[in-house]
């Protein structure tokens, strides 16, 4: 938008920045001395899925260290290092985040990962399926069947509702036996 560090008025209508509004009817918020920016996006945060639940199982005491009581507008939640889904959503929102990307979803754990993400309030969410060690992908690549690999990945992304492919050390687990 060509704006870089300028001080100016911002008009908002229905949650979107617009050219202008009726100033006589508008609510005025004095944000002098503050930075105004759109909601934050965390492109790599492990907040749902198999690895998070393994962490919760390994840290049962974590649920007693940091309890958030129910309020008139929030549910209760727990957790210090591995918070519950509701606590996670509330804390991200308090920090100004609006969007998170969960970076590791094993395809066979997709349903549960999406259930947890759906249970996390106040955030737009997406997840990256782990396909770098997916056996079908490795076989297609080994046999130089690139178009079939692409078709399989496209089908997989649709079937498990992935946003982008997470590839970590492609073939690494397979190489180690």
Model-derived segments and spans:
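Metal-coordinating catalytic core of metallo-dependent amide/deamination hydrolases
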Residues: 118-177
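Histidine-rich, glycine-flanked metal-binding segment
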Residues: 2-38
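General beta-strand structural signal in soluble alpha/beta enzymes
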Residues: 29-30, 101-102, 127, 167
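Divalent metal-coordination and catalytic microenvironments
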Residues: 10, 15, 33, 44, ...
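Conserved acidic residues
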Residues: 26-27, 98, 163
């Amino acid at each position: 938008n060509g704006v870089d560090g300028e001080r100016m008025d911002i008009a908002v209508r229905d949650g979107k920045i617009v050219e202008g509004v009726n100033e006589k009817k508008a609510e005025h918020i004095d944000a002098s001395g503050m930075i105004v920016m759109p909601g934050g996006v965390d492109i790599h945060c492990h907040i749902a899925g198999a690895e998070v639940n393994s962490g919760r199982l390994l840290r049962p005491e974590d649920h007693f260290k940091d309890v958030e009581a129910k309020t008139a507008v929030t549910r209760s939640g727990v957790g210090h290092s591995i918070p519950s889904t509701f606590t996670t959503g509330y804390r991200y929102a308090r920090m100004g985040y609006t969007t998170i990307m969960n970076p590791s979803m094993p395809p066979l754990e997709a349903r549960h990962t999406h259930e947890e993400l759906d249970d996390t309030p106040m955030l737009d969410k997406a997840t990256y399926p782990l396909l770098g060690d997916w056996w079908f992908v490795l076989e297609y690549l080994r046999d130089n069947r690139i178009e079939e690999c692409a078709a399989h990945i496209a089908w997989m992304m649709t079937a498990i509702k992935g946003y982008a492919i997470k590839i970590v050390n492609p073939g690494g687990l397979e190489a180690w036996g």
